[in-house]
Amino acid sequence: MGNSNRGCPFLKQTEIQIGIFGGKYKMNYTHFVSVAGLVYNENEEILLIKSPWRGWEYPGGMVEPGETFQESLIREIKEEAGVDVEITGFIGLCKNIEKDIVNIDFSCKYIGGELMTSNESAEVRWVKKQEALGMVTFPLTKKRLDIMLSEDNRVHCFGFKKEPFGIIAEQDFMVGKV
């Protein structure tokens, strides 16, 4: 098993063997998975944090080894904003095709706790949806926020490149059987 860090302590190269048609094939994977949540409160405001790196965004972060997506999201929101949430829906996913980073987006309901900052959030606040659209400026974060706020009951998937930001492929899917 190799270790190709590329700057992220959680991004490790893992070699696995799979059996296809009776044969053994070695495949190297270096994917990193993150989760993010659009958190609504009882006033239909959404939670934004001010990241030192990307400016205003919704909370989220890395899926750590041994965690489910849901556990990771609940932990990240608590760490970054100090609040407890209930995950209410799956919104979609996107992939950075240059760095094999997969981002998974959920909707959440605020259930308790006091807003507080952390080393990953210089500011934390509840804002109206329209205000949020003006505050978020990082291109990928803005694209994902537009999708999160669409409320069209579809699952959104897209691939992108980051420098310069551009959508490579995009598709929306109906939820359930069609």
Label every PLM stretch briefly.
Residues 2-3, 19:
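Targeting/processing segments of secretory and organellar proteins
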Residues 56, 122-178:
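Nudix hydrolase/Nudix homology domain
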Residues 33, 95-115, 125, 129, ...:
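Active-site-adjacent beta-strand/loop module that shapes the phosphate/pyrophosphate-binding cleft
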Residues 13:
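Cationic, low-complexity basic patches in intrinsically disordered or flexible, solvent-exposed regions
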Residues 41-79, 172-178:
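Conserved Nudix-box catalytic region and its N-terminal flanking loop in Nudix hydrolases
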Residues 84-92:
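A short coil-to-beta-strand element that immediately follows conserved catalytic motifs
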Residues 23-46:
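Conserved N-terminal beta-strand and adjoining loop/helix that marks the start
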